[in-house]
Amino acid sequence: MKTIRIIGAGLSGCEAAYYLLKKGYFVELYEIKTIKKNPIQHYDYFCELAYSDSFRSTDLNTSVGTLKKELELLDSLIIKAARYASINQNNELVVNRIEFSKYITNYLKTFNNLKIIEQEYLNIDLNIPTIIAIGPISTPNFLTNLKKLINKENLKLFDTVEPTILKQSINMDICYSLDNNLNYLYCDLNKEQFEKFYNALISAKTFNSPLKNEIELLEKNNYFSIESLAKNKQEFINHFKPINNNAYITITLKKDSVINNLYTIVNFQTNLMWNEQLKVFSLIPGLENLKIMKYGVMHKNNYINTKKLLNLGVQLKTNKNIFFAGQIIGVDGYVESVCSGLISAINLDRYLNNKKMIIPNKNSTIGSLYNYLLKTDSNFSPMRINWALVDMIGGFELSDNSKKIYSKRAIKLIKQYLKKINT
């Protein structure tokens, strides 16, 4: 029986373990939390949900609803557990955190081919097939060893994400480019517009992190949010110098390096609550009807330069026995982490059986996420699923009808992928 190691019993690690246990591998699952918890851990069960109890929408018209459906078709343990521990009947999958974690822990322990090793994993053995599925707050000792494996410049320790908005929601009669260079768009604010925007920004509510002193930690490492910058009004004004003489300040939008339909609001990394981001940033002229596809976040995180380090099978290019899963590859969100664990496990199994490693078609939600991660540049920030990542059908739009088309197409493609991996 072939031995596989999985480092981390979080969402991605447990999803990967479940798939490989079913395949008959002997799985060594390393998890240190029972002997040494990090600041956001409280229980000994696997898959502890620290930041939220929600797996977001179940509506198939949403990208994340479709992503969950794709995972169900692929027999996801985590989604099965979330359904079991669900505490509401609405279009949102909210779970009882304890029951959710208990279900996964107890289910995995029924496998005789699972060995749970409750200790810190320090030395990465390159001779043993391994999935590295560490979470956002990993032990310093393990990170030191990881840096030796991938070089420290390829590992980022903080997440400072600017909001990403849909191009079609930008009013091009107000926002403008210079010399027809659509890589950058500009939004001018006069003094009255600035004052209204500024007052809304400084009074907006921020996210309360479960990690104590997280903002202080970020600022200590020179990562400052837009709301923190706004504490000094004049410094804030100087930060957004006007391009036109008639403007008081100018805010810049930058086109995404992979998806032409997405723009980020430059230097707007933020810790504002999501509903507050929509309310405040829609006060920027030209963004009155903005659709935010990825909200800004700032938190402690560990993620690697996926495009540079990993191949199509999320396998380390420099050592074929090492695979990665979870937030460390640059996915953002519970459901996204689950799918990364499953894809890593599928491809590790295929690699060990001398089969071609494959990911789903780029117009499935799973495939679209991987297509983005494996193409984006080294300056990317973690991505969560959204419909802008799939190919357009007759011009990109977000009507209910188009979402339905995208969802049906994605589910059909995952069914085709399921047939491929089972042959």
From Swiss-Prot:
One of its GO terms (molecular function) is tRNA (uracil(54)-C5)-methyltransferase activity, 5,10-methylenetetrahydrofolate-dependent. SUPFAM superfamilies: FAD/NAD(P)-binding domain. It catalyses: uridine(54) in tRNA + (6R)-5,10-methylene-5,6,7,8-tetrahydrofolate + NADH + H(+) = 5-methyluridine(54) in tRNA + (6S)-5,6,7,8-tetrahydrofolate + NAD(+); uridine(54) in tRNA + (6R)-5,10-methylene-5,6,7,8-tetrahydrofolate + NADPH + H(+) = 5-methyluridine(54) in tRNA + (6S)-5,6,7,8-tetrahydrofolate + NADP(+). Its EC number is 2.1.1.74. Catalyzes the folate-dependent formation of 5-methyl-uridine at position 54 (M-5-U54) in all tRNAs. Keywords: Cytoplasm, FAD, Flavoprotein, Methyltransferase, NAD, NADP, Transferase, tRNA processing. It comes from Mycoplasma capricolum subsp. capricolum (strain California kid / ATCC 27343 / NCTC 10154). FAD binds at G8, A9, G10, L11, S12, G13. Its cofactor is FAD. Belongs to the MnmG family. TrmFO subfamily. The keyword Protein transport does not apply. Its main location: cytoplasm. This is Methylenetetrahydrofolate--tRNA-(uracil-5-)-methyltransferase TrmFO 2. InterPro entries: FAD/NAD-bd_sf (IPR036188), MnmG-rel (IPR002218), MnmG_N (IPR040131), TrmFO (IPR004417). The keyword Transcription regulation does not apply. It comes from the Bacteria. One of its GO terms (cellular component) is cytosol. It is found in: Cytoplasm. The gene is trmFO2. GO terms for biological process: tRNA methylation; tRNA wobble uridine modification.
